[in-house]
Amino acid sequence: FYELEKSGKVRYFGVSNQNPGQVELLKTAVKEPLLFNQLQFGLKHTGMIDAGIHVNMSDEGSFVHDNGILEYSRINKMTIQAWSPFQYGFFEGVFVGNEKFPDLNKKLEFYAEKYNSTPTGIAVAWINRHPANIQTIIGTMTLSRIEEIAAASDIVLERAEWYDLYMAAGNILP
């Protein structure tokens, strides 16, 4: 890391899919700050926030699968970068426009119309609304898709709308 930074080849360092213990272990071997952690996150992959919403409950959402990486990242000023934000499951497909998720897509369409956006734009706005300032890795090189998603950066969903989408994605609130 030191040589990469010193030579100017890398300005900032981060990790991917690491929990707090793994980040701390890596920090014992490098001097450069770890500023980013790329994690799967989106409306159909909400585990990172579920445990915080379901504290002291006994339902599936209350189980901590990542050792509190969201809280750790916020405390340590590590930016989370959401990869595959439009996927459901582990690369099972895209949820936007998918007939398997009629309730979610109905809500995405509703808010897209309200905010003069697209369902994909609203899915990004949902991520952007989280107070952790999560960055979205959109994974496209198609200019029209980049423009549609970039336009969503101006959308600020109301808190009730954020939770409405969270529940439409199949999540419950305690």
Question: Model features per residue range: what roles?
Answer:
Residues F1-P174:
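Beta/alpha (TIM)-barrel catalytic core signal, keyed to glycine-rich beta->alpha loops juxtaposed to Asp/Glu
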